[in-house]
Each structure stands twice: as C-alpha cells, then as structure tokens.
Amino acid sequence: MPKLDKSQQAFCDAPAVNIRLLAPAGCGKTLSILHRCCALHRLASSRATRFLVLTFTVAARDELKARLTEDPEFASIRDHVEITTLNAWGFRRIKSQTRNPRLLTNKDNKHFTILNQLAPVWAKHKAVKDAIEKRSSRTKEILEIMDALKALGFDHTRIKSAEEFNAHVQDLIDLELGWRLEELWETLIKIGILTSRPKDGNDPQGFLKRVYTGFYKFWLEATDQLIKSATFTLEDQKYFAFIDERQKGEDADKPLTGVAKYDHVIVDEFQDINPLDLNLVKAIVERHRATVTLVGDDDQAIYEWRGTTPVYILEPERFFASRFKTFTLQTNYRSPANIVTLAQKLIRHNQRRVDKDTQAFQTAEAEIRVEETEDINASLDLAAELVAEHIKPDGSPTRIALIGRKKAQLIPYQVYFASKNVPFCAAEDLQIFLSKTFDQLLELLEIKQRADQRRRPREVAADLLELCNLVKRYRLNNAQKEQLDGHFRRSVFGKICDSIDAVASYRGPLAGPNVGGRTSIEFADAIRSYLDATTVADAITALSCNFEGLAADFGKAEEDIFFKDPPFGQLAEYAQRYGDDYLQFLDDIETAKDHLAHVPPTDDEAPDSNDVQKRPVHLMTALRAKGKEFETVMVLDCVEDMWPMKYAQTLAQFEAERRVFYVAFTRAKKRVVFQTAKRLGKRTAAPSRYLSEIGLL
C-alpha cells in the first residue's frame, strides 16, 4: 500500500472545516485519520492544536493508538492527540464530577438498585409498583428499558411534559427508529406495566399517554434519583457526560482555551451511533467550538438492532446545523478485485446510500463459488473439507470463518467440530450451550435414554416431575411439585415409560385448576409423544412441538438466551446422523460445551489477539464479523428467509439485511464459498436473492 493515495491525500489536505469521510472497508481509514491530524497540526503551526479521536470499541482505539505510538511519522502529534472510546470519555467525566461513583456492572447490583434504592420512587407509580411486587425479577427489564430510553435520546432534564415526550417520539419515528420504540412498549406490556393496546391499532395518542403516565414519569424521577446518588449504568457513562457537557457549554462565559480545548473532534464508525451518542458528540463539539470529522461507511451500518440509524451519516447537516464537505476513500487495499466488484454490484441495489466508486488495489482475484447442499449433514461435510485445507499438518494453519445470520445456525458446526477435536473459536456473546435451559433440554434427553430402564420409584417420580415441569410455559410452583411428587411415589412403576398413566390420573392443581383432570391428560399426552420417539431427531422434534416450557419466549429470554431462538430445528436436523444413539449425541454435546467453556472475551470491545482467537476456525454471526478478515469465508445457508431474514418486510429492512450480507462476504481475502441448501430442516429452501443480485445465479 502506498503512503497516501489520491483520495486519502485529498482528505488530509482539506482545510479545517467540518468533514464527512466515507471510508469503505479496507481503504486505509486508520492511516488517513492520523495523517489528517498531522496536516491540521501543520496548518496551526503557530500554536498547539489538540485532537479528540472518539471510537466505539476498545479494539479500534487500540489500533489507532498503536499506529500513533509505533510509527515515527506521527511523532510530532503524539502529545496532541487523545484517542478514547466514547464510554471511557464519559466515565472520566463521571469520576471528575461525582464523589465515590458506583457503576452497576453485575446482575445483583442492578437488582438491588431497582428493588431497594429506587423503592421510594416506584412506590409512587402504581403500574411499576404492581409489576415489581408481582415479580421482583422484572427489575432487570425495567433497568434495561430505562437505559434504552437514554440511548434513544430521551432527556430527563429537558423532555419532561407529555407534549415534549410525544414530540420526541415523533422525531424517532422520523429517524426510522419507531420499531425500536415498539419493542420497548411491547416489553412494558409483557412485564405488566402497560395494558395491551387495542387490536385495531386505533387511538395511538391514547396509548402514548398511557406510556407517559405509566412508565415515563417514573423514568424521569428514577433517572434523577440515581444520578443524585452517584449510581450509574454503563449507558450513563455517555448520558451523564452529555448532560454535564451540554450544561457547561451553555453556562460558559467565554470559550475554552489552551489544553482544556479540543480544536478538532474526529468520530470513527459514525454510521453506528445512536441518538445519545450523537447528543454527546454534538455537546463536545459545541462547547469546544471545534471542527468535527465524521468517519464511517453507510454501507456498513448493521447495528440498527441497538437503536442506531444510518440517517446520521447520510444527512449530517440535518443534525449538526452546519455544512459538511464530503470525501470518499476510493481504493480497497484488503480485498481481491472480484470481491470488490461483487460487493459494489450488491450494495448498489440499496437506494438510501451514498454511491461510491471503490476500486481494488489488488489485481489478484479470489476463488468465489456457490455450493448447494442437500441438508445440514452435507453442509457439515463441505465445511469439514474447507477446514481441512486450512489445518494441513505440513503447514501453518490459516484462518477460515463460517458466518451465519443467526446464532442457531452455528450450533451443529460447534458440535461437529468439537466431536472431531477441531480447534475453533466461537466468540459469541450469547452462548446458548452455556444456558441453564439448554442443560435442562439435555437432561430431558437423558431421561428419554433411560426411560426403558428399571429404576427405583423415587427416581422414576423425579424424572416424571422434571418432564412435567416443562410441559407448560411456566414451571410448576413448589406446592404443585410437592403434591405431584407424592402422587407419583404412590403410583409409578419401575420404568418411566410404564408410568405415564400416573400423570393422567392426577387430579390435583396442575398449572391451573385441572378441571376433570383435563390438564393432567394433556401433560400425559405430551410426555408420551416424547417418550415414544425412536430417534434422537424425533425426540428433539417432539420436545419442540409439545413442551411449551422450551418454546421461544422473549420475556424469558431476558434471563436465559435459549428462549430467544430455541435451536430445535438445527439440533433435530443435525441429530439425524445419530439415529437412536442418544448417548453418543449427548457425549458430543458435552464435548462441545467443554470446548466452549474457554471462549474468549465476547464484548465488542475485546481485543482480537488472545490464543483462542488465533485458532484457525472461527464460527460467528455476520454482526460479529465486521472489522475482521479471513483467508476463506463460508457464508452459511444463503437462502431466502435467512438472507434476508424472514422478518424483513419494508424497504428499509431489506436494505439493512443487504448491508449485513455485504459485510459478511467481504471479510474474505482469498476465497468465498456461498453455501445454499435445498432444505432447511423439513422446509424446502430457495436460494437467496442476493446471489442473483451479484450475478452468481
């Protein structure tokens, strides 16, 4: 790569004005940012110039710091450039402005804070009070909603009245963030703070009034109380800093000078900011009267599920009330020429974007192919072949990534590679194998495996009780368990499979009144259908169909990630290779779990340099692939309803999904394999439209 190419030089030589730098992946963004600081430093040679470079991850911060420290070309600006994450900048402000601040970082502290510290506040708000007193575990959801409102730009000091609340809601809808509000309102309904809205959708203002009176007024008081008591969440690192910085800017009698002043603020990955991030950046820029440079790529805006929006980088003048000069880095130094071409061909199907003419620096081309497989077993064989090429005994291993759209897609590959002793890295922050409910699913399979064995009555009773506990959505309470256990001990035989009638004959309360034993019969039927299954795959399918306690449940997902997307389909399809060998299936799952007990740090801010990360095989979702690169990328299940996800309905959602696919396959340096499937489980699958858009089908 040359020192600076033409597009990089144009950016670096620009006058000291507000700039939007569009920086596609692999175009030398880090180098360009630091050379820009050098150029501005030279322009202001008569006085010291200070730069604030804000990143959103520790990894990005460390990359910039390393380049600044190690490259002698940047020696002249080392003492003038501050590089930090937005959260770290905010926490430094908290420490300077409060005494003995307490940061809420674990579950117990958060629970205590809501349940006890905020008790005088929620006691005055009936809807919140009733929800907490009915189920104290709701504290987690309540604190998360409080943080989400801050992230969405609600302000307890300026947005107080119902009119101000409604106006901000409309602003968020205009920013295409209305869906995020709907998620929050649905959560408030599920935890019992709000009642359900009319099915016909009429009277939206009436519903917003209930949100305001039922929860938002509590949020105003609770947020104020926590700040006054120096108690902060991670989101408060930015929220407190924003309010404090804005107030200092408004109270200032004269501009900042000297070492206290930033002359230039540079914001990296600007396409991934949310309303709170924007507010804090604006407050810093306005107080310091600094220029601002917004660096990012609207085509890589893939974190909208966090409440971010690409609108900010598409229309910066609208939010900063200033003119911006736009520069675009035009040379991709990372990717082979044909990957750059296909990426451009794909992303140009999006309408809401800034068009870019990105050219490849490399003349070499990657191997690109589409592989259609019959089912998951054929897909595993394909992956094994690719992996074998990267772990040859006579050479150094190279890195390959298997990238899925959903976490559940990765589970069969985790089990398969672990059972084959293939070292891999599954750096997922939501490890479903480590959930308590997944352990219970395995326990049910163990019960199935021993169902025909003769055992002591109390052991049979315990197994039946475990099965009954997961038939319905909510588990049995202690009183129901005691009565049912007593009944089983008097009624069961030596084998579980011979004792199902003991469930049907029970007449006590069971997940409700159990009138005429109807509920008992339902329980018995569900258990019988499960125990009658022959193969491992059939047993898993029976659990998914008849055991509501294992079904998807977004309310329960707050406590256990298993419920967000139960992996029954993937497990059942994978389990077909085991036939009726339950023990081998369970052994392989346990091997995979043991492997995953040593997963690397999973925070987005974690460095990418530890020993586990250096393993040759990486399994990840597309959202975790951003910023990484591999010799080979295998994109899993390139079919409709996966790429794009089936929830996508609107133009904006389809464009967001296209950006995710764009990010996924552009991680490759030498080879991309798009794996399509004829079937996903029992469903016939059609190839993803994106393969047609880039001309591969």
Say what each PLM segment does.
Residues G26-I33, C37, H41, S322-K325, ...:
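Helicase P-loop NTPase motor core
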Residues F319, E365, D394-A537:
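ATPase/helicase motor core of nucleic-acid motors
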